[in-house]
Amino acid sequence: MNTEAEQQLLHHARNGNAEEVRKLLEAMARAEVVADIDCKGRSKSNLGWTPLHLACYFGHKQVVQDLLKAGAKVNMLNDMGDTPLHRAAFTGRKELVMLLLEYNADTTVVNGSGQTAKEATHDKEIRQMLEAVERTQQRKLEELLLGAAREGRTAEVSALLSRPNPPDVNCSDQLGNTPLHCAAYRAHKQCVLKLLRSGADPSLKNKNDQKPLDLAHGTEMKHILVGNKVVHKALKRFEGPLWKSSRFFGWKLFWVVLEHGVLSWYRKQPDAVHNSYRQGCKHLTQAVCTVKPTDGCLFSVRCFDDTVHGFRVPKNSLQQSREKWLEAIEEHSAYSTHYCSQDQVTDDEEEDVASAMDLKESLARAQTCQQRLDREIYNFLKMIKECDVAKDMLPSFLQKADVLSEASRETCVALSDCLNLFTKQEGVRNFKLEQEQEKNKILSEALETLATEHHELERSLVEGSPPVSILSEDEFYDALSGSESEGSLTCLEAVTARAFEENEVPANSGKHRMSEGKDCGGGDALSNGIKKHRTSLPSPMFSRNDFSIWSILRKCIGMELSKITMPVIFNEPLSFLQRLTEYMEHTYLIHKASSFSDPVERMQCVAAFAVSAVASQWERTGKPFNPLLGETYELVRDDLGFRLISEQVSHHPPISAFHAEGLNNDFIFHGSIYPKLKFWGKSVEAEPKGTITLELLEHNEAYTWTNPTCCVHNIIVGKLWIEQYGNVEIINHKTGDKCVLNFKPCGLFGKELHKVEGYIQDKSKKKLCALYGKWTECLYSVDPATFDAYKKNDKKNTEEKKTSKQASTSEESDEMPVPDSESVFVIPGSALLWRIAPRPPNSAQMYNFTSFAMVLNEVDKEMETVIPKTDCRLRPDIRAMENGEIDQASEEKKRLEEKQRAARKNRSKSEEDWKTRWFHQGPNPYSGAQDWIYSGSYWDRNYFNLPDIY
C-alpha cells in the first residue's frame, strides 16, 4: 500500500479538492497507485476516519459521489462506530444523506453512543426521511421473509432472522398471513420449525380469522403447531463428504455423519461404517445454521456452547447439496433440542411421541369396534324381547347372532392388537431402561475410581491437600447437570452439606467490623413490628454424619435431577429468597457511597458492597430451600435504612427477582438471579446469570454487574471446598467508569485462595485506583502505581513463597485457613473499605449463620397479619426445620413439591400461563439485558387473589 497516496486522499477528501481526489481514484483504477480507498487516517485531524467519512462530514458532495462510484464502502465504520450516514445526518447535509441512501446506506447501524443516524441528526426533515427509508427497508425484508417462507427456503429464512436487525417474524402480507401461515399451508416443516424457534406466534390469525393450524396439512405439521413440538417418527441418518474448517490446518475433507441429533466427522467413509477413529463430534442441541448468500456451498453451525464450525459442500457433490445438509441439520437439531431441553418434570408429557401416536390410532380403531358391538348387542337384546311375539323371526335371530359374534371377534382382535403394542412398547422400554441402568452403574463406579486415583495422585505430587473452603454458594440451590443445564435445580442439596462434619468450626472471633458498619443482629430498632431481633434459632442443627453424599450424587448421572428427592437434613432453614436478602447485610456501604461527592470514592464503596454480598457464604454448608413458584419474601430494616421484596418468578429455569430501596429514597437495588450449571465429574461449576443493578438516586447514577462463577470441588472424594473466580465488571453508566474485579482461582498451592484484585478505570481505561483483599474477609484501596510496584516485587519472590507454602501445606493438609487480619498483606498507603463482621458465638450450632441471617425467618403474630400468605416465613417445611422437627419438615417439603407439581399440571391442561404478581419481564434500563423489573404496589398491602402455594 502507498501510505503517501492514502494520506493525500484523506487530505483532499477533507478539504473538498474534487479534482485531486478524481486524479487519485483514476490512478488507483489504472493500478498506477496502490492504495486503499477505505483507508483510515492516523493523524490527529482524521484519526480513524475514511475519506468518505471526511467528505460527508465537511459536505463535499462531488467528492462523496466520486468515492461511492469508485467503490468506497458506504457502511464503513470509523473508530467511534459512525458510518458516513451518521456524519452526514449529524451535520444536517440532506443532499449527502439522499446520495448515501441511493447507494444502500444502512439506516439501522448503531454507533458507539448507541445512536442510529436518525437519532444522531438534529434536522427534522432528515429524520423523517430516514424514518421513511427504515420503514421501506424493513418492509422489503419482511417481503423477503414471507417469500422465503412460502417457497420453503429454510437457509434464506435463517439468514434473514440472523441479521443484526431482522425483520418481524410475525409480519403479515395483504391477506394477513404471517410467515408461519405461509410455511404451514405449503407444508414446509423445516421453515415452520425455524420460525417457531425464532419466536413466531402460532396463535395469530389472518384476515379470514384463521390460525396457521387451520391452514396446516398433515398430522405431523398440526402436531408441531399445536404443541410446538416435533414428531420424530423416523429420524434418518444423513451422511456425506464435507470440507471442514480448522483454525490451524485450514479446510480439510471429512466424511460427516448426522445421526440421533449428533454431528460426527471421520477421515474416511469406512471409519464411519464401523464407528471407529472418529475425529470429532458435536451435539446439535439448540444448534443454528447460518449461510452466506454469496457462496452456495458454505455454511456454518453454531452449537449450544457458542462454538462455530464451518463446512463447505464439495462442488462435485450433487446428491448432498447445501440445502439438503441444512434441512438435515435442522431436523436433527430439533430432535436433540426436543429431548434435551424439554421440561422433563412434567409428568403428563409423553416421552415417546411416535409410540403414543401409534397407540392412539390403535385405541381409536378399538373404540370404533366397541361402539359397533354396543349397537349390535342392543339390537340383539331387542330381538330377544320380541321373540315371544313373532315366532317366525328365528332365521333373523340366528343371522343377528352371527353378526354379533363377528363384531365381538373384531373387537377382540382390535383390543389384542392394542395390547400387543402396549406389550412391545413396555418390553422395549424395560430393555432400554436395564441397559441405561447398567451403563450408569458402570460409569458411576468408573467415575468414583478415577476420582479416587486422581485424588491420590494429587496428594502424592503435593504432600498434603491444598487449602480448602467449605463455603455455600447462593446459586447452587438445587442442581447438578450431566453436561450443562439451566433447568430445575434440585440435586445440589447434598453437595454443600458434605463437608459440614469436617468443618464445624466457628469463624475467628478476632475479626472486627469497621466503624461505619451497623449491628444487624440486635438492638431495639423496629422491623415489621419486631422490637428486638433474635440472636439464636429455636433449635440447633442436626448432625449430618450418617448421610452419604456420593450414594446420592451417583444417581444424578444420566438422570433428570429435579426427579431426585434429597434429604431435608442437607438444608438450612432459609429459602433461597432469604439467602438473596443477605446481599443487604452491608447496606451501610451504599449509604456511604451516596454521601461521597467523588465518583471514584462512590465506585470504591459500590465495589466493596459487591464483594461483601458473597461474604456471608463463608462456612455456610447448608443449602437453602427451593422457592416455590409465586413465593415471596419481604424485609424491612429501619436500623439499616432499607426495605426489600423478592419473588420466585420462574420455576424452569429457577429465577428469583428482588427489589430493595432505601427508606430515605437514596438508592434502589434490584436484580434477578439464576445459575447456569456444568457438571465436570469431580466438580460442579455455576455461572450466575442475571444482572444486578444499584441506583444512587442523589447522584442520578446506575451501576450494574454480575456475580463471579462458583465451583464446588471434590464432590466424590476428598474434602469438599468451594471457590469463586472470574471477572466482575461494575459499570457506572453515567460517568463511564468501570471497576474490574478479578476473583482469583485457588491455584496449585492455595496462594490465591479467596483473593480479589482489580482496578477502577475511567472511560479512557486510565487506572484511577487499585482494589485488593479477600471476599471472605476484607477489601482495601490503594494508589494503582503503588499496587503495581507491589505486584512486580511479589512476582520476583514467587518461587520462594511457593516453596514456603508447600512446606506449610504438607504440615496442615486438611486445615482450612481461617481469615484473619494477617492473611491479607496490607500495602502501605492502603485504605480499608470493608471488613467482615464477626459471627455470633453460637454460629457453628446455628448452621453457621451470621447475625443478619439469624433474623431472616423470624416471625410473630403481629407480622403474620401484615405479610402476604406467600411469604417464606409462613412455609411449613422451613418453619418445622427451624424448630428442629426434621421428620415433619421432610413430610411438608414433599407435600409442597407434590402440590406445586399438581398445580403445574392443572395449568397445562387448562392452557393457563403463570402470571407473576410483583415483577414483570423486560429489558434492564441500563444494560439492555433481559431482566425482571419490579411492578410496584407491593407496599400498598392490598394482597388479593394470591396463589395458594403452601
UniProtKB/Swiss-Prot annotation:
Disordered, as annotated region: 795-821, 881-913
Tissue localization of expression: Detected in prostate and liver.
Keyword Repeat among record annotations: yes
Domain PH residue range list: 235-334
GO biological process, any: lipid transport
Location of this chain's protein in the cell: Late endosome
Chain spans, region Interaction with RAB7A: 1-237
Sorted UniProt keywords: ANK repeat, Coiled coil, Endosome, Lipid transport, Lipid-binding, Repeat, Transport
Coiled coil: 430-463, 877-913
Top-level taxon: Eukaryota
CDD domains reported for this sequence: PH_ORP1 (cd13285)
Annotated ANK repeat ranges: 47-76, 80-109, 175-204
GO CC annotations, alphabetized: cytosol; endosome; late endosome; organelle membrane contact site; perinuclear endoplasmic reticulum; plasma membrane
Motif (FFAT): 469-483
Keyword Glycosyltransferase attributed: no
SUPFAM superfamilies noted in UniProt: Ankyrin repeat, Oxysterol-binding protein-like, PH domain-like
Matches recorded under Pfam families: Ank_2, Oxysterol_BP
Compositional bias segments (type: Basic and acidic residues): 890-901
Family affiliation: Belongs to the OSBP family.
Known partners and oligomeric status: Interacts (via FFAT motif) with VAPA. Interacts (via FFAT motif) with VAPB. Interacts with the GTP-bound form of RAB7A. Interacts with OAS1B. Interacts (via FFAT motif) with MOSPD2 (via MSP domain).
Task of the protein: Binds phospholipids; exhibits strong binding to phosphatidic acid and weak binding to phosphatidylinositol 3-phosphate. Stabilizes GTP-bound RAB7A on late endosomes/lysosomes and alters functional properties of late endocytic compartments via its interaction with RAB7A. Binds 25-hydroxycholesterol and cholesterol.
Domain notes: The FFAT motif is required for interaction with MOSPD2, VAPA and VAPB.
Protein name: Oxysterol-binding protein-related protein 1
UniProt source species: Rattus norvegicus (Rat)
Gene that this sequence comes from: Osbpl1a
